[in-house]
Amino acid sequence: MYRRLLLNLFCMVFLQACLKPMSDPKAEKVDSQVQCGFGSKDC
């Protein structure tokens, strides 16, 4: 139950980070954190 809730929350944050314009500093920070989780080069 909790695992599914966390997964939904993660997906929502990920989608918001992708959909928001990169000019928004908050969105950019969230996006970089998400990419860090995936082991991106930007980390």
From Swiss-Prot:
Keywords: Signal. It comes from the Bacteria. Residues 1-17 form the signal peptide. This is Uncharacterized protein HP_0122.
